A protein has these predicted regions:
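Outer-membrane beta-barrel translocator domains and adjoining extracellular loop/strand segments
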Residues: 11-16, 33, 43-48, 85-93, ...
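Solvent-exposed loop/turn segments connecting transmembrane beta-strands
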Residues: 6-14, 54-56, 79-89, 186-190, ...
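Transmembrane beta-barrel strands of outer-membrane/channel proteins
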Residues: 1-5, 32-36, 75-79, 90-92, ...
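Residue-level signature of outer-membrane beta-barrel architecture
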Residues: 22-24, 66-68, 96, 139, ...
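Short glycine/proline- and aromatic-enriched beta-strand/turn motifs that initiate or cap beta-hairpins
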Residues: 1-24, 28-31
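Hydrophobic, lipid-facing positions within transmembrane beta-strands of outer-membrane proteins
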Residues: 14-18, 58-62, 88-92, 103, ...
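Repeated loop/turn-to-beta-strand initiation elements of outer-membrane beta-barrel proteins
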Residues: 27-32, 70-75, 100-105, 143-149, ...
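Extracellular loop and loop/strand-boundary signature of outer-membrane beta-barrel proteins
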Residues: 3-6, 46-51, 76-80, 91-93, ...
Length: 250
C-alpha cells in the first residue's frame, strides 16, 4: 500500500496505490495494481478566471510473469479512466539472461488504444492509437558496477491535439468580432529515445546512479536529459537525493 503526494506550482496531486502479487507454482506469478491520482490545480488560466480545477484519474492493471529457465515472459493489461480521457494498454515483454547471468537482453512491445474527449462536450470523442517497441541490454561490469542501455521507438496515430487548446482570431463576420480555431497537429508521430544508466554500489548499502537520455521525433523535437542520484538506506528508511538537467528544442 502506497500513498503519493506532490505539491508545487499551484498543482497538488495525491492518492493511494495498492499492489498485490501472488505466486502460483514455481514459475508463474500474477500481479494487480490499483492507482488513483487526485489533481487540484490553479494554472495561469485558472488563476485569471478565479476558477479552481480538479480531476481524478483511476488506473487498474493486471499482469502475469512466467519463468522458464533463464527466460522470463510477461504480459499485462492496463486501463486508465478520467473525465476526458480513457486509455487501454496491452503489453508483452521477454527477457533472457546470458553469459552466466551477467547479461540480460529484454525485448518489449505495447499497444495503446486511447479515447480523447472534452469534459465540457459529452459528444466530443476522438481516437488515438499508440505502438511502442523497446530493446534493453543490462550488463554487470564489475562486482559493484552495473550498466543498462535502452532504445525505444513509439509511433502515434490519430487525434494528437490538445482538445482544449484554441487560437483566437479576428472575425468580422460575427457580432463579437472574433472566433476560435482549434489547434491543428499532424495525425502521426514517431519518436526515438536512447538511454544509458550506470549504477555503482558503495559501502554501507549506498548507491550512486548516473543516467543520460536522448530523445528525438518527427515533429522536430530534440531533448537531452541527464541526472545523477545518491541513495542511502538508514534503518527502515531509504533516503535519495537527485539532480536532473533537461534541455529541449523544437
Amino acid at each position: 500500500i502506497l500513498y503519493h503526494l506532490y505539491e508545487g506550482g499551484g498543482v497538488r496531486i495525491d492518492g493511494p496505490s495498492i499492489l498485490m502479487r501472488k505466486q502460483v507454482g514455481p514459475s508463474t506469478s500474477f500481479v494487480t495494481n490499483y492507482y488513483v491520482d487526485m489533481i487540484s490545480s490553479a494554472s495561469i488560466d485558472v488563476i485569471t478566471t478565479a476558477s479552481p480545477y480538479s480531476e481524478e484519474r483511476t488506473q487498474w492493471s493486471v499482469g502475469m510473469d512466467y519463468l522458464r529457465g533463464n527466460t522470463t515472459m510477461s504480459v499485462a493489461y492496463t486501463t486508465s479512466t478520467e473525465s476526458d480521457f480513457d486509455a487501454k494498454t496491452y503489453s508483452f515483454a521477454v527477457s533472457q539472461d546470458m553469459f552466466g547471468d551477467l547479461t540480460t537482453l529484454t525485448l518489449s512491445y505495447a499497444l495503446g488504444d486511447d479515447t480523447v474527449g472534452r469534459s465540457d462536450d459529452p459528444l466530443f470523442e476522438r481516437d488515438a492509437d499508440r505502438q511502442q517497441y523497446g530493446v534493453g541490454l543490462t550488463q554487470i561490469l564489475t562486482r559493484n558496477l552495473i550498466a543498462t542501455l535502452n532504445y525505444q521507438v513509439v509511433t502515434d496515430e490519430g487525434f494528437l491535439n490538445n482538445p482544449y487548446r484554441t487560437v483566437r482570431y479576428a472575425d468580422p463576420t460575427v457580432p463579437r468580432g472574433f472566433s476560435f480555431e482549434p489547434e491543428l497537429y499532424p495525425n502521426t508521430r514517431t519518436s526515438n529515445a536512447l538511454g544509458v544508466r550506470m549504477k555503482y554500489f558503495l559501502p554501507y548499502r549506498a548507491a550512486l546512479e548516473a543516467e543520460y537520455r536522448y530523445f528525438t521525433d518527427t515533429w522536430d523535437i530534440e531533448a537531452h536529459t541527464a541526472s545523477i542520484s545518491y541513495t542511502q538506506p538508514w534503518g527502515d528508511f531509504v533516503f535519495t537525493g537527485k539532480y536532473r538537467y533537461h534541455d529541449q528544442t523544437g
